[in-house]
């Protein structure tokens, strides 16, 4: 699950979150950007109460740390990322969110690696903190995959190539990310526009 960007008043979204537990997931992988305001934290945790009783892992996105501000989505096509706000942005209660998740038994993968058993299978996971705000330190978890694991999983919020390429090079079997909401810019019939198709790869 990713990019809920929850506000307490969003009843339709909250109902959707509450219904997710009925899917009976073996594992919840949360890739961040959970909420948009401090008063949304408790509603978020209430709505996720069923999921929080299941095995889970998480990394944070920018909107777990900071209140979101509108940015031009086309800036991704021009600069490879949206421009950062020039004015101070209020913080969100991210440590309270972290504490709630870890108290429920979820594994914090922000620049960390963890192993757990799910449905009789050994899973080894590594993750990064939010690359969109340069909080990522992949070097802290980099290295070869766990040869004894049934599945090696990479988790990050913003799918920046420096992280995706590193995880693939290190032998991750699958990588989960969020942030783009299906594409920052989507065109009729063709779908998401990727800046990697429009710009040369950075070297």
Predicted regions and their residues:
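Active-site-adjacent loop/helix micro-motif of nuclease/hydrolase catalytic cores
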Residues: 8-12, 39-40, 136-139
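Active-site glycine-centered loops adjacent to acidic/histidine catalytic or metal-binding residues
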Residues: 3, 32-33, 61, 157, ...
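A mature extracytoplasmic/lumenal domain signature
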Residues: 2, 62, 127-129
């Amino acid at each position: 699950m990713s990019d809920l960007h929850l506000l307490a008043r969003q009843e339709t979204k909250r109902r959707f979150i509450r219904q997710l537990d009925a899917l009976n997931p073996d594992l919840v992988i949360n890739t961040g950007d959970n909420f948009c305001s401090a008063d949304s934290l408790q509603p978020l945790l209430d709505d996720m109460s069923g999921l929080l009783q299941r095995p889970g892992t998480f990394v944070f996105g920018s909107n777990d740390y900071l209140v979101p501000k509108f940015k031009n989505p086309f800036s991704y096509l021009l600069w490879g990322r949206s421009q950062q706000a020039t004015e101070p942005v209020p913080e969100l209660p991210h440590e309270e969110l972290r504490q709630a998740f870890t108290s429920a038994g979820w594994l914090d993968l922000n620049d960390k690696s963890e192993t757990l058993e799910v449905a009789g299978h050994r899973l080894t996971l590594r993750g990064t903190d939010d690359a969109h705000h340069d909080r990522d330190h992949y070097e802290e978890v980099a290295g070869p995959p766990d040869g004894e694991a049934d599945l090696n999983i990479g988790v990050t919020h913003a799918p920046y190539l420096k992280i995706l390429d590193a995880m693939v090079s290190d032998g991750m079997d699958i990588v989960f990310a969020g942030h783009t909401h299906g594409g920052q810019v989507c065109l009729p019939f063709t779908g998401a526009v990727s800046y990697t198709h429009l710009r040369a790869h950075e070297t």
